[in-house]
Every structure is written in structure tokens, then in C-alpha cells.
Swiss-Prot record:
Record's function text: Binds single-stranded RNA. Involved in the process of mRNA degradation and in the positive regulation of mRNA decapping.
Name of the protein this chain belongs to: Enhancer of mRNA-decapping protein 3
Key word RNA-binding present: yes
Gene encoding the protein: Edc3
Positions of the UniProt region annotated as Required for P-body targeting and interaction with DCP1A: 1-79
UniProt-recorded Gene Ontology molecular function terms: identical protein binding; mRNA binding
Domain DFDF: from-to ranges: 192-228
Organism: Mus musculus
Region (Disordered): 98-194
Keyword terms: Cytoplasm, Phosphoprotein, RNA-binding
tRNA processing among keywords: no
Sm domain span: 1-68
Species lineage: Eukaryota, Metazoa, Chordata, Craniata, Vertebrata
């Protein structure tokens, strides 16, 4: 009976042009002499259609790979089943272009005869005898492939019609069974038809498996092997390479000395740079003596004012935003700086700073009270400042009422303490505190002023004074004092500036 062969796994050889098909028998039609296979494989590759049908004339060789046991035929489903000829009889079948064709039934003992295939080349038929010993044959490639697919549903190989036709140009298109759009439905089932129960219950433990890997032991084994072989591509550990980089020291460096500056008197306050170098503070008397000795050796007041103005203007330009604020695209947003200067050398330093700021396209407003007699240094600086686009005012009413970008304070001088009692001084302090703009003090004094201007930044010259909290964050600028000048006043000095002229200091 035909039902006895349903569910059997067979291998059908259709010649060189059509190739070899393998699959499970789903239907045998004795009238039309056709046989149908489900889940077919063509030359080891799974077909895109769920079922193919073969004519007897197209079959060159038929092998039974596995015969199902009792009860296995029930898994085939409700299929169209007809009787099969006697066992031991082989059939020669063929597939036409539309999947149907005339059936020619021949016994296994019949002689070979060529069969004509419509629109195909002639295929030489061969006789196949089915022996009972073939029932105990081992599992074919089809079973092994089907089992691997069922064990690992996460890995699926997809093939399109282009790849199949490019590998086998003479391959006939198998018959598509099912309803309309059945092929798309089968593709969807193949991609999304996995049961959720077959997914692994636990995720892969990456950390646990990584902990099992003893990297030190593996590296030691590799190192031992490379030592024995006498060659090593990455260099032997604990051995100095033959060549050095251009920035690598060959000689061992000496221990770093962070205290390179020492002063002759006891230090009341110490600062340190970003690199850790200690910078001690000096008293006002020692600082004044240092400037006097430097002036005697050629560092005149004019040169000191110029150097102070350059360093202070560089710091002010950085505080104003640097290149992000001062560029051709922001010409309409020029920063505004208010300079508060007194009639002394400290004020002359502020005027020099304002001149350099005005040269860098900064809107500068200089406040300097009117005096009958001015210092020569102030007169010279005012003469240069008047050649810029800066504005000079002598009344606080001419200062802007709106907040400015920066206020530079040069009002205080230890040698002119009486100026703090002047009305203009008190009014200038009140204006600076009400303007709410950040304040930069240039060379501020040491004393604590009860009603002075609280600075956010302070710039010291050469060596810092023991400034208090009112000075804000302290910066130090290099005004060009030679090292031997420091030694002449009893200071063992080594420059802490490095590649800069203005460096920040931190309280030690």
C-alpha cells in the first residue's frame, strides 16, 4: 500500500541537469505516477518551497534512506495518498516546467532507456532496485541536517532565488504547493515560527567565563615558550630595548626638588604652582628692595611698567574669553573694561595695561581723578593711552551704570594710604561693588581694607606678597628680573614659570 511508504526519507537522483533531491515522502500517486517530498533539499541546500513533486520519467535513481516504524505515518498529515507498487520496484519520474507530467512505471529489472523531458535535455534513466538491507542504512545528510536545524533554531541559513539560480543555472523550479501567497507565508514561518519555549532559559555568563580564564598563566606560558625558542616579537619583559624614543630619557632622572626658592626671612605664607613647585611669599620691604636693585641694574621703571602692562593685559584677555570672545565674528560684542587707577605707580601700571587692551580692540574706560601735579610715569602713560580708542574720565558719573565685563583695580598703594580717605576713592569703591562685575587687582597691597574692593583675581609681580582672602585667586607674572638680582638681595631663586609669563598660585 502507498501508505506504507509515507514518511520515508528518500534520495532522488534526477541526473546532472536537475541534481539530487532528498526529503520525506508525503504523497505517492500511482495514477499520475508522481511522488511528492516535504521539506526537500536540493544538492544539500534546503529548498524555498515546502513540497516538490517528481514525475517518474525524471527520476534516474531512487534510494530509500530510512523507513518509518509503526505509527510514524500518522505524522505525515492529511495528504492525498494512493497505492504504491510492489516493494522492490523502482520508478523513473520527471518534472515538467509546470510541476506535472506523464508517469511511466517500469520495474527495476527493465533495461535503461532515455526519457524525454519537456523543454529540457534528455536524461539517461537508470534502474534502481530497493533491497531490504537498505532499511538499516545509516542516517543520510538530510537527517543530520534536519537534526542540526532542530537543535539550533537560532542559526538559519537563508537563500534567495538569485543565489540558487546562479549556482545551478539548469535547475528546474520546483512546484509550489499551498494557497496563494503560500511562499511568502512559508518564509514568514521560517523566520518567525520558532517556539519561544525552545529559547535558552539562562543568558550566557560573560563575567563568569572570563573569571575562569587565567590570563597570567597563559601569558607566562607564552613567555616561557618564546624564551626557549630564542625569538620574541614583543620584546622580553624587564629588559631594556635596544633603541629609545626621541622623548625618552636614557639616563635616570634625579629626584625632583620642589623647593627651589628660599628667602632670607621667615615665611608667613607659601604658595605652590600647578606642577608642585613651592613659591614663598616675601614682605613688602623685601619686594621693594628687589625692585630697587633691579632698577639699579637697568630694569627701569618704564621697562617694568611695560612688562607689567603686557602680562596684566594677557591675563585680562584670557579672563574676557580669549579667542572665543575676541574674533572677527564678534565685532559687534566688544568687551568693556573699566580701569580704576590712582595717582601713583600702581595706577601707571593699570594705565599701561589699559593701553594694551585698547590695542586689542577692547573698549576701555579709564577712571583717574584730577590732580594738579602728576607723576612723570603717569603723564607718559596717559600720553600713550590718549592715542588709542580708550576713553578717560575723571568723574564717577561718567562710568557706565550697567555692568561691564571686567573691572581692573589699581587704586591702592601702601605709600599713599591717605588716599583712602578721599571722597573719590570711597565713591570708586562703592561703584565697583555695585557694578557686580568681576574684579582683577594688579599688584595689590598686603593690608586688609575693611571697606575695600573684593577682588576675584590678583596679579603679583616677581614674587607674591602674603595676600589675604580679599585678594581672591593669586597669579604671578614674570617682569624680567634676572636671577643674580634675586641673589643680591638674599633670595635663592629658580624660575617657576616654565614656558609661561603668568602662572596661577595655590595656597600651600
Amino acid at each position: 500500500m502507498a501508505m506504507d511508504w509515507l514518511g520515508s526519507i528518500v534520495s532522488i537522483n534526477c541526473g546532472d541537469s536537475l541534481g539530487v533531491y532528498q526529503g520525506r515522502v508525503s504523497a505517492v500517486d500511482q495514477v499520475s505516477q508522481t511522488i511528492s517530498l516535504t521539506r526537500p533539499f536540493h544538492n544539500g541546500v534546503k529548498c524555498l518551497v515546502p513540497e516538490v513533486t517528481f514525475r517518474a520519467g525524471d527520476i534516474t535513481e531512487l534510494k530509500i534512506l530510512e523507513i518509518p516504524g509503526p505509527g510514524d505515518n500518522q505524522q505525515v498529515g492529511d495528504l492525498h495518498q494512493t497505492e504504491l507498487g510492489p516493494s522492490g520496484v523502482g520508478y523513473q519520474m520527471s518534472i515538467s516546467q509546470n510541476g506535472t507530467g506523464k508517469v511511466v512505471k517500469k520495474p527495476a529489472s527493465s533495461s535503461s532507456a532515455p526519457q524525454s523531458i519537456p523543454k529540457r535535455t534528455d536524461v539517461k534513466s537508470q534502474d534502481v532496485a530497493i533491497s531490504p538491507q537498505q532499511q538499516q542504512c545509516s542516517k543520510s545528510y538530510v537527517d543530520r541536517h534536519m537534526e542540526s536545524l532542530s537543535q539550533s533554531k537560532s542559526f538559519r541559513r537563508r537563500h534567495n532565488s538569485w543565489s540558487s539560480s546562479s549556482r545551478h543555472p539548469n535547475q528546474a523550479t520546483p512546484k509550489k504547493s499551498g494557497l496563494k501567497n503560500g511562499q511568502m507565508k512559508n518564509k514568514d514561518d521560517e523566520c518567525f515560527g520558532d517556539d519561544i519555549e525552545e529559547l535558552p532559559d539562562t543568558d550566557f555568563d560573560f563575567e563568569g567565563n572570563l573569571a575562569l580564564f587565567d590570563k597570567a598563566a597563559v601569558f607566562e606560558e607564552i613567555d616561557t615558550y618564546e624564551r626557549r625558542s630564542g625569538s620574541r616579537s614583543r620584546g622580553v619583559p624587564n629588559e631594556r630595548p635596544a633603541r629609545y624614543r626621541h622623548d625618552e630619557n636614557i639616563l635616570e632622572s634625579e629626584p625632583i626638588v620642589y623647593r627651589r626658592i628660599t628667602v632670607p626671612h621667615s615665611v608667613s605664607k607659601e604658595f605652590c604652582t600647578d606642577s608642585g613647585l613651592v613659591v614663598p611669599s616675601v614682605s613688602y620691604e623685601l619686594h621693594k628692595k628687589l625692585l630697587s636693585v633691579a632698577e639699579k641694574h637697568g630694569l627701569t621703571l618704564e621697562r617694568r611698567l611695560e612688562m607689567t602692562g603686557v602680562c596684566a593685559s594677557q591675563m585680562a584677555l584670557t579672563l574676557l574669553g580669549g579667542p572665543n570672545r575676541l574674533n572677527p565674528k564678534n565685532v559687534h560684542q566688544r568687551p568693556t573694561v573699566a580701569l580704576l587707577c590712582g595717582p601713583h605707580v600702581k595706577g601707571a601700571q593699570g594705565i599701561s595695561c589699559g593701553r594694551h587692551l585698547a590695542n586689542h580692540d577692547v573698549q576701555v574706560i579709564l577712571f583717574l581723578p584730577n590732580f594738579v601735579k602728576m607723576l612723570e610715569s603717569i603723564t607718559n602713560e596717559l600720553s600713550l593711552f590718549s592715542k588709542t580708542q580708550g576713553q578717560q574720565v575723571s568723574s564717577l558719573r561718567d562710568l557706565p551704570a550697567s555692568p561691564v565685563d571686567l573691572v581692573i583695580n589699581c587704586l591702592d598703594c601702601p605709600e599713599n594710604a591717605f588716599l583712602r580717605d578721599q571722597p573719590w576713592y570711597k565713591a570708586a569703591v562703592a561703584w565697583a561693588n555695585q557694578n557686580r562685575a568681576p574684579v582683577l587687582s594688579i599688584d595689590p597691597p598686603v593690608h586688609e581694607v575693611e571697606q575695600g574692593i573684593d577682588a576675584k583675581w590678583s596679579l603679583a609681580l616677581g614674587l607674591p606678597l602674603p595676600l589675604g582672602e580679599h585678594a581672591g585667586r593669586v597669579y604671578l607674572c614674570d617682569i624680567g628680573i634676572p636671577q643674580q638680582v634675586f641673589q643680591e638681595v638674599g633670595i635663592n631663586y629658580h624660575s617657576p614659570f616654565g614656558c609661561k609669563f603668568v602662572i596661577p598660585l595655590h595656597s600651600a
